From Swiss-Prot:
Record-linked SMART domains: EFG_C (SM00838), EFG_IV (SM00889)
Protein's name according to its UniProt entry: Elongation factor G
Domain tr-type G stretches: 8-290
GO cellular component terms, semicolon-separated: cytoplasm
InterPro entries xref list: EFG_II (IPR041095), EFG_III (IPR009022), EFG_III/V (IPR035647), EFG_IV (IPR047872), EFG_V (IPR035649), EFG_V-like (IPR000640), EFTu-like_2 (IPR004161), G_TR_CS (IPR031157)
Amino acid sequence: MARSTPIERYRNFGIMAHIDAGKTTTSERILFYTGKSHKIGEVHDGAATMDWMEQEQERGITIQSAATTAFWKGMDKSLPEHRFNIIDTPGHVDFTIEVERSLRVLDGAVFVLCAVGGVQPQSETVWRQANRYKVPRIAFVNKMDRTGANFYKVRDQLKAKLGAVAVPMQLPIGAEEGFKGVVDLLKMKAIHWDEASQGMKFEYGDIPADLQEKAEEARTFMIEAAAEANEELMEKYLGGEELAEAEIINALRTRTLATEIVPMYCGSAFKNKGVQAMLDGVIQLLPSPVDVPDVTGTDVDDENLAMSRKSDDKAPFSSLAFKIITDPFVGALTFFRVYSGTLNGGDTVLNSVKGKKERIGRILQMHSNNREEIKEVLAGDIAAAVGLKDTTTGDTLCSIDQPIILERMTFPEPVISMAVEPKTKSDQEKMGLALGRLAQEDPSFRVKTDEESGQTIISGMGELHLDIIVDRLKREFNVEANVGAPQVAYRETITLADVKSDYKHAKQSGGKGQYGHVVIELSPLTAADRADAKLAPAIKDDFLFVNDITGGVIPKEFIPSIEKGLRETITSGPLAGFPVVDVKVKLVFGSYHDVDSSEMAFKLASSMAFKQGFAKAKPVLLEPIMKVEIVTPEDYQGDVMGDVSRRRGVLQGSDTTGDGSASIINAMIPLGEMFGYATALRSQTQGRATFTMEFDHYEPAPNNIAEAVMKKG
């Protein structure tokens, strides 16, 4: 089927912001303006449009959308129609995993900032993530109508706090209650939006006299930023020639795509001003799928063989599943981004990560207020597939004939666990199914059964993360659950290198005996080992096994059993039963018996040799250390810092927020000391402080803590 929108006119972008910048209102306004400009149902010729809204209302549920498709022809309808796939990004830093996964599939971003609060701590976290993925972005300074709004202060903070070269494309006309509109620095005209039509209509006017000089200065700065795109433009500009509007836009686009500049827009989403012009900026300055580097991946059979796919309908099909949403009626909705090729409903594809085939049943396109079943998706599209069985977040779905594994998303290991049980025994099975579904949606959440106690253990990224999981059990699956006290995910390791351990497992009293003899050397796993091209591929679960046997003193067929014995032993360490990490084991010698040696005998020998060697290698217990950021009014700073120290925290420094109203305290605090911190901080600061926390690293626990944990274990 022919494309209705050329791929060059696609914009896959996210709205990024910290929690108070007005992201929701901005997103709503985007859907409002774009929804009005296009009659849904004409997207794919003859495709059935199925409005699910009534059914949703009857059921009292909302199928949340991870990506919404909309269309935009420009504020004054002068641009060719562009297709927007707007990817949802959460504002809460406790769910950095969510931000990461949306950044993985978007090509550009609109960064929403509050004109009053400016660049806040959470903005910095999200900005750093976007830098890591080299995401081109434009900034929208929202809430220009609020008391204390200051566009110029935010511009300066973008430079001072985030190191960004901010290039205003507009200046505000007035601020706070007097915010009337913006000056368009490209056209050198004032824009006023009509309030009666909720900003659907607007008119150009003259720039107010008191802004003329400021506008000239800002335009010069913008043109200079454009001229730096290439020598030809710079010569033209320095020679006194006027640059055409198209030249300026193309040059600014080049520099935005290279993440050299951040063009700035402003407005008030709440007052229906500015969002429309910012959407024109999305078209003019953010990338299409063909403007970003080809997606990279590896060969299915050889992870060292790099491959790539062009954003082209004719290329082999490749896509990435980036979010799974469980809906009680439709089942699992798998959102995926198509990087290359095309896919039709009913096709069978390969999940190259799992090595399993999946049949694509229905494909749904999400719009602002309805869902549409579509026949096919093309390169650059984002859609949802219904009913995939084996696909989880981060998996690649691709053509069976020309498979590829796209670059995986990295998901952090959980750092906190708690036991959970249903309040009524009859809910046991229901709870198991519900937890399984939630784990499929969220790769940073894990579920397992404790073999000794039989309890169900859930693990996640923090207390808040698990609280929300328990809340969702109740809200979405009607399972009331009791939870145990949170448990810290400690680890065990060794500190001495080259520790030899010799163990002989021999039972030879009549009949067929058992005989396995191994000599191993234990050492801490080093950064050099991880960087070694030969060793690195063999490191799994932070453990490296090296076979140094020569001359056949142990036959080859027993080596896998020896490794298996070691790997099974490290899942529950000798100190307190926690997983063993960062250990290298070399198999250096041993012996065997022609008749009595068996795989089981060598497995037992390697397990016992490891336990004995581990005890001699100065073992230590490792505890997770969290990076904590606390924002508190200055009056409480002393109390908060004192409490951080009592929790064995190490202060990393402090700062003040953009508007100077609060202190930002950065610290490294052991997770074991952070339970109940939300409540403690609330009572210390009368509910006026907030904090965010993410896992940073493991380090040895002090002796008193280690002893207490080992006693419990």
